Amino acid sequence: MTNFRLNVLAYSVMLGLTASVAYAEPTNQPTNQPTNQPTNQPTNQPTNQNSNASEQLEQINVLGSDNNNDNTPPKIAETVKTASQLKRQQVQDSRDLVRYETGVTVVEAGRFGSSGYAIRGVDENRVAITVDGLHQAETLSSQGFKELFEGYGNFNNTRNSVEIETLKVAKIAKGADSVKVGSGSLGGAVLFETKDARDFLTEKDWHIGYKAGYSTADNQGLNAVTLAGRYQMFDALIMHSKRHGHELENYDYKNGRDIQGKEREKADPYTITKESTLVKFSFSPTENHRFTVASDTYLQHSRGHDFSYNLVKTTYINKDEEELRHTNDLTKRKNVSFTYENYTVTPFWDTLKLSYSQQRITTRARTEDYCDGNEKCDSYKNPLGLQLKEGKVVDRNGDPVELKLVEDEQGQKRHQVVDKYNNPFSVASGTNNDAFVGKQLSPSEFWLDCSIFNCDKPVRVYKYQYSNQEPESKEVELNRTMEINGKKFATYESNNYRDRYHMILPNSKGYLPLDYKERDLNTKTKQINLDLTKAFTLFEIENELSYGGVYAKTTKEMVNKAGYYGRNPTWWAERTLGKSLLNGLRTCKEDSSYNGLLCPRHEPKTSFLIPVETTTKSLYFADNIKLHNMLSVDLGYRYDDIKYQPEYIPGVTPKIADDMVRELFVPLPPANGKDWQGNPVYTPEQIRKNAEENIAYIAQEKRFKKHSYSLGATFDPLNFLRVQVKYSKGFRTPTSDELYFTFKHPDFTILPNPNMKPEEAKNQEIALTFHHDWGFFSTNVFQTKYRQFIDLAYLGSRNLSNSVGGQAQARDFQVYQNVNVDRAKVKGVEINSRLNIGYFFEKLDGFNVSYKFTYQRGRLDGNRPMNAIQPKTSVIGLGYDHKEQRFGADLYVTHVSAKKAKDTYNMFYKEQGYKDSAVRWRSDDYTLVDFVTYIKPVKNVTLQFGVYNLTDRKYLTWESARSIKPFGTSNLINQGTGAGINRFYSPGRNYKLSAEITF
């Protein structure tokens, strides 16, 4: 990565800081300036959310207050959830965050959990996600990559999550608007802001909090600790939380078919740990200057079994097995930041915030194939029950091992292990002869580990040369020893080279072999943010201006690891390769046998993607102009300059396989010779060089310059009526994999396309809101038009050219490429309302009723449905709060309509042999009832209880249904019968409990 250089933003800050000295006027400080007193601490200084002034959150005490009785009319297409609301609704993950939001759902990703959000007909990378102004990891969105790899569970191709306990506020913005976050906000954006010490120190100079919780749906336990304090000019916050649980249990989980394969009815078993630590340390030398150093880390670790993996030898879990597919996945995020805030009023700003952040995100999928370590494992099998006692091998009865030539049931004489009465030992499966192996003792064969065997005493061996010879039992002294790394080994060497002396051991490896594949997707970001606000009056018109910029460098790379090794050796496992015939130690290079214990192998790092560094330079401004008491206008503009710079360095960067790119654009030179079939013969060096030349050809710089805008108006003709309109534009630049991903195979070749254009969206929306002390009722109509959608297009059959213009291959290649092809339109209507019953009936003070509703419909060009559109959804809420907030409760009734066949599209319907393109397995309509309550027996203790799916309804969400794959090895069902679909159903009746104490 190139050096993180200063840009024009840094110089403007330096100029502004100089100006702040000259224009500092303490007597004219605004009322919300920070001081060392808690009552004046602002909790919502501008971040890189880049919202205009009218959209800035009002200062709130997010811990002590609850917006459950808030009558403020909602902003158009926007939902804001404070920490108190998240706590009240017992939100523990992204699914809970949008549980009672209509028009927003979480994208399901099977074994890897969730992957971002779906809003307005688009999902994942088309819905921006930021944490404290930093974009979170994007998925590899190339459709070609998804078709090749996503159905097989080899990549954790998901968007990372956040820890809910650390959040000050979560804002969900629906509709295209890149003024706020830049690239990615096509369907909307989800913006998170973390807490700091000021949010806790509103009444005193210290705070201690502890929270414990439990959820039955996934058996998740929560422990969270919060420490905050202030001393003179310093304040600090430490928050640590740990969640430990299991898989989300589907409906009727306990009675589901516990088998392997795609027809499995139970959710695959996983042990999931989520751990988060947020540390912020601040220094305020004066009331106008504040410096903060912060560290925000989040780790999600999941281990378990892919029992639903389709490539299994048997559906029965309790049968003998060679290996089982294990998962060991993680998502890790770490952000270290430095922030400077200035609240001195100058001609250029009222508030200034300058921050530098360094974030690293890793999403890892690790698959390990091994047996679980019991006697059913082939590598541990010991059917004869041979034992090691006092350094000697004995039979299952504890007697010395006896080997005889015995006639078997087929009339053939074979070596068999017998008891002291010369009767062959029985075995549960197979034959006695197959259950043991005679290890030949000699310097070039088998050595005993003297830390396990007693090498000072004679050992029993059997002399025979062929398997049909009567073995001769002997006791021999181990006459050859050697020492390796301080460990002693011994064997026996006969004076007659024709003699063969064998030691009887179980016929298995004696250790646990493990094959692994580990795929890392790494996103590294270095970013500078500058955000300023200024309130001023021009020609008697009030303006609230926010402006600033971003300079960021982001590197996206893939690192693949693979290999095998052995572990957990038993007493009979080989511990050394022995010596060669030349009397030197035998090495793994010389040994042709597979031995993961003695010769583990870890492949060199590889990749399917060229690493790409993305440089983003952005400038923005947003102004809320109050033209009249009844009319205000919002104007927003943003300019983004985004450059992609591939960074493939041969020998340093993880290697891209030569066969994926060779001859793709640059042909091989004329061959020096031909094989016996007349095919040209190239040296490995020629092939390597040609692959590097093709990568260099593919790795071209790409630059995008985009303008975004947002126009809005708010009209209040009456004190109870508000009309809002909004017209905004969003965009998403192609991801690096969409531009550069390359794959060469006769059946499926993908070409890179550096000529793609950014996707665009234009959003039109109008909202009508009635509001008063009794509450509010708001309805809005929206339409979003998308263009330049990126999709995978079939280019036909082609043949690569050789150096003289002829065909390079014997057969044509089926060629695909990412291109801008589709347009789309989504339209719909939403309702959001709240009624305070106490306004009409004094005795019912504290009661409220709410209602939310979303209906949307969308089509791509060619009348193709958009699968990311949610079915019609409504949420009715009934709540109560004690006037002193000692207790309260909420009842939610959610109704979701069925997903109609005409509103779904299966892009693989022809390959599956279907006549129509509708998705075969869809969600039906369902109604859910949830009840949540809290009680504060004393001021500093809060107890919460929630019951979800109160009526124990069996239901399948559309997001879960559309996560079912039509091909591959993971997330499958029997498409013909539907067997296995129960695994995708949501939990039945489940509960959440929590207790929190604060001081």
UniProtKB/Swiss-Prot annotation:
GO molecular function: siderophore uptake transmembrane transporter activity
Region spans: Disordered: 25-52
Listed SUPFAM superfamilies: Porins (SSF56935)
Motif, TonB box: chain positions: 58-65
Annotated segments matching region 6 X 4 AA tandem repeats of P-T-N-Q: 26-49
Domain spans labelled TBDR beta-barrel: 203-999
Pfam families reported for this sequence: Plug (PF07715), PT (PF04886), TonB_dep_Rec_b-barrel (PF00593)
Other information: This protein is subject to phase-variable expression associated with alteration in the length of the CCAA repeat region. This mechanism is called slipped-strand mispairing. Addition or loss of CCAA repeat units would change the reading frame and result in introduction of stop codons downstream of the repeat region. This may be a mechanism of regulation and a way to avoid the immunological response of the host.
Free-text function comment from the UniProt entry: Acts as a receptor for hemoglobin or the hemoglobin/haptoglobin complex of the human host and is required for heme uptake.
Protein name: Probable hemoglobin and hemoglobin-haptoglobin-binding protein 4
Originating species: Haemophilus influenzae (strain ATCC 51907 / DSM 11121 / KW20 / Rd)
Record lineage: Bacteria, Pseudomonadati, Pseudomonadota, Gammaproteobacteria, Pasteurellales
